[in-house]
Amino acid sequence: MIGLPPLVLYLFKSELFNNLIIISVMANKKLIKDVKSIFTQEFVSNLLSTAFYGNSTMRMCRASTNPQSLKAAKAKYDCTEDINAHILLHNGVINVEDYNDCDYDGYPRARELNLDKLIYGFTLCMFNSPGSYASIMEGEDDMYDDLKVIQYALFGKIIYA
């Protein structure tokens, strides 16, 4: 039963996912009631580090964010992914530079990523790429699985296979 996609029942209660309720019963009987409860510091940090490590199409960089939040994150964490995860979890924004979409000067176009977009990307991955979703939830994910979440968050679909 390991290879089966998850059974997903969903209910949207608000327009910005503040009360997004998702009940997911997977092959290992894991039950998720609120998708936001998945997004812990460790989960977001692992997702970002796996998606962007060795990635030649996109990279993370910090956007202008609340200076106090950035200072608190830098005091608490050393790793860039941990700092960026902290920023996202505290209503901040990070930029993702897309090397395949350059502006007129040849510089990569930066796209904003916040927690709501990341949750939206995760939800789209759950419905459109159940194998990747199952891998992420079981801790067996790789760059391609996590990059799907980022692409769904930024574009609403998979752009780079």
Task: Report each predicted region and the residues it spans.
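Extreme N-terminal basic, low-complexity initiation segments
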Residues: I2-V8
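Short, Lys/Arg-enriched N-terminal segments with co-localized hydrophobic residues
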Residues: V8-V25
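Long, contiguous N-terminal structural blocks used for assembly/anchoring
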Residues: M26-Y99
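Alpha-helix boundary/N-cap detector
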Residues: K30, D34-F43, R109, L113-K117, ...
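Short, hydrophobic/amphipathic alpha-helical patches that form generic packing surfaces
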Residues: N46-Y53, Y120, K148-K157
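Acidic, low-complexity, intrinsically disordered interaction modules
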Residues: C102-R109, L113-K117, G121, S129-S132
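Acidic, proline/glycine-rich low-complexity IDRs
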Residues: S135-Y160
